[in-house]
Amino acid sequence: KTALEFYRPVYAMDCEDYDGDGEKEAFVVLGKKNSSSKAIQGIYYVYSDGWIGPARTNFSSVDLFSNTNYVEYDGKSFFACDVSGGGSGWVTYLFSTQNGIYYELNLSGSLQSFFKKDDTCYTTKNVFSAQYGHQYVDVPLNYDKDTQEFSYPES
């Protein structure tokens, strides 16, 4: 962490055994230099041997919205990061590892939260009504063990 902070502010870091090899790796959220908010520069993956790879760096004017989230599901480890560009919602980016290499899941960037409850993974959907304002409804996600990807339930 100290070496990374030399280059950019470290806003969040989750160290876990993401690839299941018994050693810890990390997903790290780095900020933009001299930012008064928590403007995100990128999300990086730190391998157990110290090598660092860019998981996603094409952010444009977004801030870290909340703490990052580590989720274990069906023997896999997932890293979720919520970002916001202002307004009433946020976007969640979702990452994991496959065959020892990090990857971004297909639903990444289209989710709004990612969490596990009662052995099911969920996202939320923003429902607005004039009477109650913004409400966030839990939406269960389907998981395909073969592709190691989540999908929305069929409508």
Residue ranges and their predicted role:
Residues 1, 85-155:
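Acidic, small-residue rich beta-repeat scaffolds with periodic aromatic anchors
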Residues 1-11:
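Extracytoplasmic low-complexity, Pro/Thr/Ser/Ala/Gly-rich segments
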Residues 2-4, 53-60, 101-106:
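A short beta-strand motif characteristic of beta-propeller blades
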Residues 21:
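Acidic carboxylate motifs that coordinate Ca2+ or other divalent cations, activating on Asp/Glu
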Residues 26-30, 78-84, 123:
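Hydrophobic beta-strand segments that make up the repeating blades of beta-propeller
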Residues 33-51:
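Beta-propeller domains
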